[in-house]
């Protein structure tokens, strides 16, 4: 079986690319949840207890901490969902559990961590290093020589300025880059930045 954990919006969005990727294996596509119910979009919904180590699963949860918590407890092995419209260039390493939605791209010599989610029309350019459990919302522009720390969230339409081989642009662990932000400088661990140019959000 190839299982999608979660029947929320993102999980349902992944049905199309999953079927396209699986081809003749698409009959084995299921949703998996902790408390199963009837079919969703014609896809069977099973319990986590029904998964085995022979099955593959991807976790369709946007929240990084929750995604990691679920991934760590599932018995099935992490799969990868790479939409047929995705383009992956040479010398690219992709970690287990990664999801590349339709019309995404990784150009060359990039390192992609475990359970990365790359939503529609986002790209990762040359020599980038993406950590584990990172989320890219739609239309993220991650230019060359950018390092993104574990569990960071990059919002819709954000632009990450190109770094250099000697000084990559760094997005810290657990940082949040707001939608439409233009990031020209490093972002600290756990920081929230918004705007153009992106600046730390002033909290009340």
Give the label of every model feature segment.
Residues 29, 55, 96:
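Conserved acidic residues
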